[in-house]
Amino acid sequence: MPHRAVTFTGIPFENPFLLSSAPPTESENNILRAFEAGWGGVVTKTIGLHPVTNVVGAKAKFLRTSPDDASVSMKKRPGAALHSSWNWELISDKPLDWWAPRLRRIKEAFPSRVLIASIMAGSGNDKELRNWQTLARACQESGADGLELNFSCPHMDRKDMGSNIGKDEGLCSVVTEAVKEAATVPVWCKLTPATRDMVVEAAACFRGGADAVVSSNTFPSLPMIDPETLEFEINVDGKVSSGGLGGPAILPMSLANMARMTRAFPDRAFSGIGGVSDFSQALNYLLLGCGTVQVCTAAMLDQAVGPRVIQKLNAGLDAFLERHAADGWRTVDDFRGIRRDRVVLQSEIRRPDASDYEGGYEHVEGYAAPVIPEGYAPPTRAEARVS
């Protein structure tokens, strides 16, 4: 008999699928609806000490592509397929004092479901580190099963928050360590893809004591410009700032980032996020080594909390385990990470005839052939400039 249940960072989940920190998890009612729908866990909208003020107008929209001309636009039109989501929403506009009693009520209503509190404060001084600790203590005392540190929002209105922490390995380590000093529950770090190498920041989080890394948040991006009006498709008074791109378009990039991290830290815990709407996509993250998978965009388009999405995910997992019963697979752990080591350096991919391959170097008659170290990868342009 197949089992959906997993244990991740010491927390038992009824299934490995979570609704991620985003607009769908911004209210008590939505989180309760998500648990009623069957999600194994929910990560709250990011909680801060004080309320924030979002921009006027739309905070998020969806980009669609037309099969006839392949255009990508936020405009709704017949036959267009989902391409991605775009948002420039900040963290929760409700302060910690608003969230604390609601966390308690949610856990009382669903004691067996996993409630993760996403939190964020600033960085760069001891006061902000204490703010992280205050948030951690309040959320865990209110019933949160774990904490997710938001090091990844790409468009915060303060320079010492969000992805600006996630781009700095020193801050990743220091903030994580400060939270771990106060935490009695597992601590996850949610990283930004907007960095040179996420392995570096993941390592910093683990040095700080992180129990897991979540990858990744949305990719920094701009909305499209309407070719007729020459205005950004989402703007305020004609102006726009960078926002976050999510949904199907980021799936391959998110998988590549995840593969680098799970290969670097095969014995560590990872939660995958980015571009998932059904089990076949979630399976990619599990096969690369993730213990849980989070969903946002697909849920937003399905009654805000994704009742049909979680049904498909659970049904897909059940069917997959049944198909592989002869392989002895009964749980996610039986197949988790079995494709992680298939991701290798490009130089390790077989050529039609290895004797003809010079590793990208031209063989010049009269000169000795270059000695190419095993596993060598040519430097990027940026690396070449630095050297």
Where are these regions (language model features)?
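Extended, intrinsically disordered, low-complexity segments
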Residues: D68-K76, L251, A259, R308-S387
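Glycine-rich, positively charged N-terminal anion/phosphate-binding segment
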Residues: P2-T7, S27-F110
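Active-site beta->alpha loop and helix N-cap motifs at the rims of alpha/beta catalytic domains
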Residues: D68-E169
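N-terminal small/glycine-rich loop or linker at the start of catalytic domains
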Residues: R4-S21, K59-A60, P78-S85, I106-G122, ...
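Active-site mouth loops of central-metabolism enzymes
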Residues: F13-S27, N87-D93, I116-W132, W188-R196, ...
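Glycine-rich, proline-tolerant flexible connector loops at the mouths of alpha/beta enzymes
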Residues: T46-K61, G79-K94, L147-K167, N217-M224, ...
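Alpha/beta enzyme core
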Residues: L32-A37, G41, G122-S271, S280-V295, ...
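C-terminal helical cap(s) of enzyme catalytic domains, especially alpha/beta-barrels
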Residues: P51-D69, L222-G243, L286, A298-R330, ...
